[in-house]
Amino acid sequence: MASVAELKEKHAAATASVNSLRERLRQRRETLLDTDVARYSKSQGRVPVSFNPTDLVCCRTLQGHSGKVYSLDWTPEKNWIVSASQDGRLIVWNALTSQKTHAIKLHCPWVMACAFAPNGQSVACGGLDSACSIFNLNSQADRDGNMPVSRILTGHKGYVSSCQYVPDQETRLITSSGDQTCVLWDVTTGQRISIFGGEFPSGHTADVQSVSINSSNTNMFVSGSCDTTVRLWDIRIASRAVRTYHGHEDDVNSVKFFPDGHRFGTGSDDGTCRLFDMRTGHQLQVYSREPDRNSNELPTVTSIAFSISGRLLFAGYSNGDCYVWDTLLAEVVLNLGNLQNSHDGRISCLGMSSDGSALCTGSWDKNLKIWAFSGHRKIV
């Protein structure tokens, strides 16, 4: 029987071999790709989206949290936003009036993720307690904000990093976790339907940070991980990932499907956003910025979102910048961080309203801001 030292040696050799093959595959793909989206678009005479500093303005500042804002989500149909903060509360906001309709005090204050149910009647949240809690917003809360939990989803062995309801299904929810897995839940029973990763060899090998469900085909979702990869999953086949996407050189913090459902975007600690083709596995474009002028360091990408057409990519950064990228030409058309009433801290989360008319950003400065296209500006 092989000793521990021999097994470690074999494991190291196998890992080196895999990394070598992966690098050869990456180089081979680069030779086959004679262009990228930006070069092709420029060759066809496409011009950047014209943006002025007054075209996207901060129309609301949502103040009420007493700690860093970590996560936010919009309702699919109505103008409501839920936010999760280091202060241990979920707040539900009316995006039109800035009024708080709920301020839910959580049993575990270390919350990292939140999501609205498709019908807007429930919210989910998860964090360092390794559980996902469901609250029915029709339940009565006491004067301190304590509200009964309608369901607690337990089973993860690490923190819950993100959660998202399956579109148009109030009873299905997907979570990602520091235990290297994603889980599909039946919210009604509180039971796990499927586990993605874990003991399966095609799963992630480090913390899973983010998930995004394909609204065009809700059987498919992608997950981004600290193992620098993104994996595509089919909820009908949990035993293996459909495809693994390489390209990033550090943790993948955010993943988001493109509006057409055929591509998806990513944001990473390596300071770049990337666009991938879901079907071919090819990386279509890299959106890379210059280092921060003050620190000379490359800010990390914390969160991303697409405009309703997909022409714009919004990317939040650790230094407080929020870039608006032209996805076709890979050029920055606006930095919300330079505008009046911008955040004074790390952008931790952002999300686009379902009709594409407004962007909400959350920050470590304890505030959320709603950015809307000005009256004369056509929604892109």
From Swiss-Prot:
Keyword Repeat among record annotations: yes
WD repeats: 64-94, 106-136, 155-186, 203-234, 247-277, 296-326, 342-372
Role this protein plays: Guanine nucleotide-binding proteins (G proteins) are involved as a modulator or transducer in various transmembrane signaling systems. The beta and gamma chains are required for the GTPase activity, for replacement of GDP by GTP, and for G protein-effector interaction.
BP GO annotations: defense response to fungus; endoplasmic reticulum unfolded protein response; fruit development; G protein-coupled receptor signaling pathway; jasmonic acid mediated signaling pathway; lateral root development; plant organ morphogenesis; reactive oxygen species metabolic process
Organs and tissues of expression: Present in the root, leaf and tassel.
Repeat keyword on record: yes
GO molecular function, one term: signaling receptor complex adaptor activity
Quaternary structure note: G proteins are composed of 3 units, alpha, beta and gamma.
One Pfam family recorded for the sequence: WD40_Gbeta
Family to which the UniProt record says this protein belongs: Belongs to the WD repeat G protein beta family.
Classification of source organism: Eukaryota, Viridiplantae, Streptophyta, Embryophyta, Tracheophyta
GO cellular component, one term: endoplasmic reticulum
Name of the protein: Guanine nucleotide-binding protein subunit beta
Keywords: Repeat, Transducer, WD repeat
UniProt organism field: Zea mays
Entry-linked InterPro entries: G-protein_beta_WD-40_rep, Gprotein_B, Guanine_nucleotide-bd_bsu, WD40/YVTN_repeat-like_dom_sf, WD40_repeat_CS, WD40_repeat_dom_sf, WD40_rpt
